[in-house]
Swiss-Prot record:
Lineage: Bacteria, Pseudomonadati, Pseudomonadota, Alphaproteobacteria, Hyphomicrobiales
A family per Pfam: Rib_5-P_isom_A
Entry protein name: Ribose-5-phosphate isomerase A
Active site, per annotation: E105 (proton acceptor)
Source species: Bartonella henselae (strain ATCC 49882 / DSM 28221 / CCUG 30454 / Houston 1) (Rochalimaea henselae)
Summary of the function given for this chain in its UniProt record: Catalyzes the reversible conversion of ribose-5-phosphate to ribulose 5-phosphate.
Amino-acid positions noted as binding substrate in the UniProt annotation, renumbered to this chain: S28, G29, S30, T31, D83, G84, A85, D86, K96, G97, G98, G99, K123
Gene3D superfamilies: 3.30.70.260, 3.40.50.1360
Name of the gene this protein is made from: rpiA
GO cellular component: cytosol
Family per similarity comment: Belongs to the ribose 5-phosphate isomerase family.
Pathway membership, UniProt: Carbohydrate degradation; pentose phosphate pathway; D-ribose 5-phosphate from D-ribulose 5-phosphate (non-oxidative stage): step 1/1
Amino acid sequence: MNVQQLKKMAALKALEFVEDDMRLGIGSGSTVNEFIPLLGERVANGLRVTCVATSQYSEQLCHKFGVPISTLEKIPELDLDIDGADEIGPEMTLIKGGGGALLHEKIVASASRAMFVIADETKMVKTLGAFALPIEVNPFGIHATRIAIEKAADNLGLSGEITLRMNGDDPFKTDGGHFIFDAFWGRILQPKLLSEALLAIPGVVEHGLFLGLASRAIVAMADSQIKVLEPFDF
């Protein structure tokens, strides 16, 4: 099975947890892009849900496939958030934000009673950090913010390249108008301390470490099995 087929398997399994009248968070990324059309089929067959999307692209997909969309302003508490991940580490710690929607993804996850991560087995890691950590920053004073990030990382024994994410010749902008640094630090052995250090920097808006948010991971394996994991399974 190829990776896209595995992503679709995980998305199909996630649908089993969606019930009538649920308020759903809809994440972003390639695996969620497989989930949205499948959810649209269920809606067309009578499933009643209301959804909040974490990115403009996911919202557009929901409209395309007939998935009802609302906002957190109208429904500030959600039953279930379905999202992907760039890495799934010990105790279901995550790195997210490769697509640039990390701030909205974290807001929606925090507003949800449960967050289920859907992924293929390539996203499972023993230690976070092989995937670059996205750090969303305010455009004002980004060079000063970068220096502060480097110092915070150095204090935790982390070193490596920090690059400003680009979109052609211009900096990539998030839906919220922020920029993103991608930090290539390798193994992140103290994610909680790193999270606290980054959030203490005034120019940092949010980062891609999702700690204590995911309650289950639905992982499609290469042998066609699907594992439904909880944090203590890691």
